[in-house]
């Protein structure tokens, strides 16, 4: 039987249940609570209180998301786009990417080693194939170019 979210307590409990599983951004949490039938005024009040109590934090969510996606092999371009689509502020996204402490060149090199066994492309077709894969994963074209020309990774 579905939970009815018609009281502040029910909305808060559901929000806390979602936050207990993983970090969420305010926009994402609002969307999930609306999908469950909570009225907007109860959602706003509950989320404001969670922010005041330090239980809901955009910066913690950004840090968690960037770290998770980087560990999954995705680069800064892709992560930035995913966060934009989730409705987060561009300045906050840029700050999170700057402060994450991730060496994107090293991550790119690790992904390339894992996928292509460290084999530099021998012809234009192979270079394009490797470049497409790495670009799709969200790495900047200048980094990819340096790596595939043999000048990246070990600078």
Curated annotation (Swiss-Prot):
Record localization: Cytoplasm
UniProt record, GO biological process: regulation of DNA repair
Pfam families: RecX_HTH1, RecX_HTH2, RecX_HTH3
InterPro entries named among the record's database cross-references: RecX_HTH_1st, RecX_HTH_2nd, RecX_HTH_3rd, Regulatory_RecX, WH-like_DNA-bd_sf
Any one Gene Ontology cellular component term annotated for this protein: cytoplasm
Keywords recorded for this protein, A-Z: Cytoplasm
Family classification: Belongs to the RecX family.
Described function: Modulates RecA activity.
Protein name, as recorded: Regulatory protein RecX
Source species of the chain: Pseudomonas savastanoi pv. phaseolicola (strain 1448A / Race 6)
